[in-house]
């Protein structure tokens, strides 16, 4: 099953709807990327909320437009809060997204993520090694993102998408987005995106927010990947290194005009 190239015209249309809706996105993410994730969502036009206490996470997940669960700095108490939020989201039919950070290397988070899959995520976003591990096809590894690695993990992503009935994103130099039947590829970005902490985690938050939009979930999630790739390219052109890249990236998201980018490429 060969992937199709995602259409930037559709990404431009989806971004207009995203900014109009400004989805309230409940981010249960890791401690390292809280601020960057919130700023990424704000720059694109979404409304982030970082609610983590179990007593608050359960009711808040029911009123949010979308939920992100990122296990990067997972603890036992945080796992309890995340499960409570996911159960609430499931009952309320709030779409939720799983980011299974380092799931192949650590047993506690692997078991936790596998257990959560029964509560039907709308989307899963990970690098090649994470998707392979979650699909039960490989364990361990650092999860280095390369075009070859992401493409090699695509069959696992497609199988996982069919098994869970969700969208699976494998990120790398080229991102692959699949529902198990149809697969889209999103090239672009810049190597500087891998030289700062949080671009993948922030993408997961944008993917989660995009799942709140009406229409085809596959196209909405692929559009989210496209926005981040385009912003990364634009920011790299204005940056001298990782330190200047971060503010340039947020500015690029804020000023993102997919139609203009489409016309110049």
UniProtKB/Swiss-Prot annotation:
ATP binds at residues 125, 171. CDD domains: THZ_kinase. It comes from the Bacteria. This is Hydroxyethylthiazole kinase. GO terms for biological process: thiamine biosynthetic process; thiamine diphosphate biosynthetic process. It catalyses: 5-(2-hydroxyethyl)-4-methylthiazole + ATP = 4-methyl-5-(2-phosphooxyethyl)-thiazole + ADP + H(+). Pathway: Cofactor biosynthesis; thiamine diphosphate biosynthesis; 4-methyl-5-(2-phosphoethyl)-thiazole from 5-(2-hydroxyethyl)-4-methylthiazole: step 1/1. Its EC number is 2.7.1.50. It comes from Salmonella arizonae (strain ATCC BAA-731 / CDC346-86 / RSK2980).
């Amino acid at each position: 099953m060969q992937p199709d190239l995602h259409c930037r015209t559709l990404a431009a249309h989806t971004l207009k709807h995203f900014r109009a809706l400004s989805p309230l996105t409940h981010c249960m993410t890791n401690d390292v990327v809280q601020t960057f994730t919130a700023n990424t969502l704000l720059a694109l036009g979404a409304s982030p909320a970082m609610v983590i206490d179990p007593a608050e996470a359960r009711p808040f997940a029911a009123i949010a437009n979308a939920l992100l669960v990122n296990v990067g700095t997972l603890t036992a108490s945080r796992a309890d809060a995340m499960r409570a939020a996911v159960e609430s989201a499931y009952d309320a039919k709030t779409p939720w997204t799983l980011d299974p950070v380092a799931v192949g290397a650590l047993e506690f988070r692997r078991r936790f993520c596998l257990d959560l899959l029964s509560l039907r995520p709308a989307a899963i976003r990970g690098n090649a090694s994470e998707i392979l591990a979650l699909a039960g096809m490989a364990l361990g590894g650092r999860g280095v993102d390369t075009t070859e690695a992401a493409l090699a993990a695509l069959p696992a992503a497609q199988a996982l998408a069919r098994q869970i009935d969700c969208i699976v994103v494998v990120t790398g130099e080229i991102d692959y987005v699949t529902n198990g039947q149809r697969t889209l590829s999103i090239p672009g970005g810049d190597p500087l995106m891998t030289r700062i902490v949080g671009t993948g985690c922030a993408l997961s938050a944008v993917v989660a927010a995009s799942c709140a939009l009406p229409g085809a979930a596959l196209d909405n999630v692929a559009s989210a990947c496209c926005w981040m790739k385009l912003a990364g390219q634009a920011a790299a052109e204005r940056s001298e290194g990782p330190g200047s890249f971060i503010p340039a990236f947020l500015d690029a998201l804020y000023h993102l005009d997919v139609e203009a980018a489409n016309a110049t490429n």
